[in-house]
């Protein structure tokens, strides 16, 4: 099982801050694609190219491998000012 967290705009669009996800996913991108198929709000919240991912609290590329028990966090790019 994966623990999937959502922050900022993805959290607001989806209406959830976290979910438990069962299944066999090879990469964070596979998780993103699976969740984006849950509906229009999910697809908008998890739009490729507008999202960063952290696996076990480390910023990683979407193509990074995931395994059972991992924590995956999706969030928009952070800007400063």
What do these predicted regions represent?
Residues 1-79:
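Ubiquitin-like/PB1-type beta-grasp interaction modules and other compact soluble beta-rich domains
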């Amino acid at each position: 099982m994966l623990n999937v967290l959502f922050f900022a705009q993805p959290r607001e669009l989806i209406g959830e801050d976290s979910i438990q996800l069962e299944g066999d996913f090879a990469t964070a991108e596979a998780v993103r694609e699976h969740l984006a198929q849950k509906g229009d709000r999910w697809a908008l919240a998890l739009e490729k190219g507008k999202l960063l991912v952290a696996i076990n609290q480390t910023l990683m590329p979407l193509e990074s491998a995931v395994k059972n028990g991992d924590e995956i966090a999706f969030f928009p790019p952070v800007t400063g000012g």
